[in-house]
Structure formats: C-alpha cells, structure tokens
Amino acid sequence: MDSNDLERERGITILSKNTAVRYKDTLINIVDTPGHADFGGEVERVLGMVDGCVLIVDANEGPMPQTRFVLKKALEKGLRPIVVVNKIDRPRADPHTAVDKVLDLFLELGADDDQCDFPYLFASGLAGFAKNELEDEDKDMQPLFEAILRHVPPPVGDPEKPLQLQVTTLDYSEYLGRIVIGRIHNGTINAGQQAALVKEDGKIVKAKISKLMGFEGLSRVELEQSSAGNLVAVAGFTDANIGETITCPNEPRALPLIKVDEPTLQMTFSVNDSPFCGKEGDFVTSRQIRDRLMRELQTNVALRVEETDSPDKFGVSGRGELHLGILIETMRREGYEFQVSQPQVIYREVNGQPCEPYELLALDVSEEAVGGCIERLGQRKGEMQDMQMGGNGRSQLEFVIPARGLIGFRGEFMRITRGDGIMNHSFLDYRPIIGDISARRNGVLISFEEGVATFYAMKNAEDRGSFFITPGTKVYKGMIVGENNRPQDLELNLCKTKQLTNHRAASGDELVQLQAPVEMSLERALEYIGPDELVEVTPESIRLRKMSKKFARR
C-alpha cells in the first residue's frame, strides 16, 4: 500500500492508505497507518475511523519505539489489538519472546485486562501465510481474516439516523478539487444529495455531494449510496477541514472534534540567496515556495506555516525532523530550490512554567559502543532508563532525553557505532526546560573563493579536517566544504591550482589519493548545521553554507 516514492525508499508509511476486501459475506475496511511519531496527525485520525486494529511486530526485534507510540494511541481509544508476529521464517526469529515483549509493553502502557488478553497469530507477509500456532501448516492468510471477524466488533452506527460523517483525511484532485475521506458514523449518504458541513467554529456550510467514492482493493470506485460503518471519499466541500462533520442539512449534528498533537519542531524556509541561486531549480521565488507550502496545508494536518516579517522567509513547524525532512525532500523532487535553517524545538508553557518536548530514545548497539553512547547522551542531558545485554554481543539502551538533545546526534551515533547501530525515538511529553546542551564540538571548513575545488588544494588542506565534497565540485564563498579538526571555523581556498614547472608533472597527483568524503544526505545535513548555518536545497544538490551576510549574494 506504500505507493509514495519516499515510502518505498525508506521502508516506512508516511500517509495513511485505505482499502477494502471482501471475505465471505463481510466487507473489511483496512487502513494502513504510519508508525513513526512524527506522523502522529495521521495516526490519531485513522484510529478514529476503525473498530479494531492489527498490531504487526517483528519476530526477531519485537516492538519498536514507534510501536509504543501507535499502540498507546490505540489503547487510549479503547481498541483491542490483534497481534501478528511477522517474519517468523527469518533466521534468529523468536516469536514467543516477541509475544512476551508485546505483553510487557501493553502492561507498561496501562492496558486494561481485556486488552492484555489479546489474540495473537504467527505470520510471514513475504510467504503469504498466517497461523494460530507455530506447529500449524503454512497455508494462507485465512486465519488472520477469521481472527478479524471473531475479534473486531461490527460498526455500531445506525443507517436510519441523520447523516454524520467525520472528515479524517484530506486529498486533492485537479478535476474534483478537495476530497474529504472519512467514516460514516450514522445515516446514509447519496451522490448528488445536499449536505451540510459543520465547521470548527459551529458555522454550517451547505453544498452538493458532487461525487461519492468507496474503496476496493487499491482503487477508488464510484458509488451511488453508502451507509453507516463504511469509509468513503466525498467531493463537493471545497473548504472542509480535518475533524469537521458532514451531516444532514435539516438536522445538523456535529461529532466531537479530533484533537491532534501540536508541532514540536520548527525551522525557517527561505528563498535561496547563495551565489548559485536559480541555477538548478524550476521553482525559486518566494511566491512559488509560499504557494507550495500553503498547498501542503490542505492535506498535512500536523504542519503549520507562518509568514514572517520578511516576504522571503516562512516559519514551518512539524512533529519532528523526519516529518519536516519528508516535506523538504518532496519539494526538492518537485523542482523547488530554497534554503532551510537548523531545526529548533518549540517551547510551551505548562502550569505557568516554560517546558520543552522530551523524547523516548531506544538504541540497539554493539557492546563496544555502549560506553560512548552513554557518555555522549549524558552530555546531551539524556537519562538512561533501561539497559539490556543481549547474548549476541548486542545491547539495548533506553533513554529519556530533551528533543533538542537529539538534534545533530544521529551523525555522532553513527560514528560511535561505526554505522552498526539502530536508533529510534518517539515523543514522550513536555517537561521543564533543563538548561544548556552542548552543541557540535568541531568547527567547519569554509570556502572563501568561488570556483571549482581542485585535488591539489584539497590535498594540501586534508590535515585540517574531513571534507564533504570531492575535487571538481563547484564551490562558492561561504559554502561549508568540511568539518575542522578544531573547535573554530576555518576559511580555505580550495580552488588553488598547482603551478607546473620542469621539475613538476601533472601525473604526480595520480600517485596519491584523498580520503573518502563524508556524504551529506538531507537528514544528516539538517542534523549537522548550527544556528548560524543553512542547508541549500535544490533538485540536484544538497549544500551547507554560512548564514552570515558577508557570504550572501551581493
């Protein structure tokens, strides 16, 4: 169901998906929800559309930190999950231990007795089978469908009551305009009928249902009528928003509004003003960037966009680095060129006291890396809650840490673990501000010339630090080209060429090599930059640069 390019590349669900399958005489509506806490806006709305849920856990890894986030929301909604232990055909799979870990998590999250008595199955999605006991034959998915019919209660809505349809997801079509997706809680809806939309402020807007669609497989099918319990997509209401209710115009009854977690992280999107501006992007002006951000608000409920004192800058807030990183990467692939600032946490006042967001951080590392992780997280105000030593030379660590303590940590974590560690985190709560957190300890290497970086200049400067670029890369004044070995920033001329004489030959460079550059992905760049630095984003390049006006375009 993950059709978005970024979803396929990252192996995560970003946008919720709807489908429906018919098993025996029952239509089963299925909604795939994101698991990562950054997409909490999607998760909470989806849980309001369903009567039950299937919790899928890995037979080897057990519940992940993002599992905790989704499960907590499901339990708060009173849902009773069916647990499916997946990938039981993998090496090192330990299905029964995974079930025990799930039970521990249920108890930790305050599940009631009925929820803790959850049904569970063993499955392999790749091989296409599910079974009630490990000793059963590997056949098909029928045991899972039977479990759904047995344990998920039928819809409680009444098709004879006045219409109540809650908007839980927004979509957009060039032909139909805004499309609202939601569940019919009561009543019946017909294509072409007049309906009323109860807005958040209580205002009632009337409109005609121009198109009514249902779900079948991975497609949408046009419907003439649908009734309570079904998930439908409706066109006709151009200004509908998440949580509002489509109802009967003669007897309007609004459902309770959906509460979504507020953003915890913010950054500034601005027009690219580097010396290379406008050379690689199709959409580069402030108007084009603003229009794209406003369009994103139509479907991305957890996002906030604010205009600033400068017409070239926009404040963008989201649920986390992944949430904002997905938006930046999507815009980049669409041809947009812009620059973004370092992510900053959003502070809140709780009971008259300034507070900041805290995260639950889970690490899976080799035993040799445990000491380095504990030391560095301690410097970032992290408190270790749990530590488990595995029998396979691996250790699982759990920390509670301020969200700002995680900004820039992933790069350090990969160095400490030599790329062998697994890191996951999810939003926990707001707590009093804890004080200063140590920032990046090394300065950066900055180009003070515009031109093309040469092997000769880079080789001479190699002992100053590590580079982010290779010879032949175009650079400009103020562009960050590497990390200094010392705490201070250092400006370099990387465009210097070798002066050839009778005693020197160009072939001499072929005998020596540069160290491999540090690759800067978008996520790594966002974590790496400091408060006086920017990430320049274009369809072709990710560059780091200084914010100082002396380096900006004249």
Regions from the PLM with identified roles:
Residues 1-554:
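Structural and coupling elements of P-loop NTPases
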